[in-house]
């Protein structure tokens, strides 16, 4: 849903940009849980 999309964008601009890897995956997995 839209929440998941916005959450993924936030992940991409923060966690994924800074470190990536497992932390990025975890962030996006949390987004998926939001649906």
Curated annotation (Swiss-Prot):
Disulfide cross-links: 7-31, 11-27, 16-24
Function: Has antimicrobial activity against Gram-positive bacteria (C.glutamicum ATCC 13032 (MIC=1.6 uM) and B.subtilis ATCC 23857 (MIC=1.6 uM)) and Gram-negative bacteria (E.coli ATCC 25922 (MIC=12.5 uM) and P.aeruginosa ATCC 27853 (MIC=25.0 uM)). Displays very low activity against the Gram-positive bacteria S.aureus ATCC 9144 (MIC>100 uM).
Keyword Disulfide bond annotated: yes
Residues recorded as bearing Methionine sulfoxide in the entry: 5, 9
GO CC annotation terms, alphabetical: extracellular region
Organism domain of life: Eukaryota
GO biological process: cytolysis in another organism; defense response to Gram-negative bacterium; defense response to Gram-positive bacterium
Name of the featured protein: Turgencin-B
Modified residues (Glycine amide): 35
């Amino acid at each position: 849903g839209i929440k998941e999309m916005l959450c993924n964008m936030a992940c991409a601009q923060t966690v994924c940009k800074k470190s990536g890897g497992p932390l990025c995956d975890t962030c996006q997995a949390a987004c998926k849980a939001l649906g």
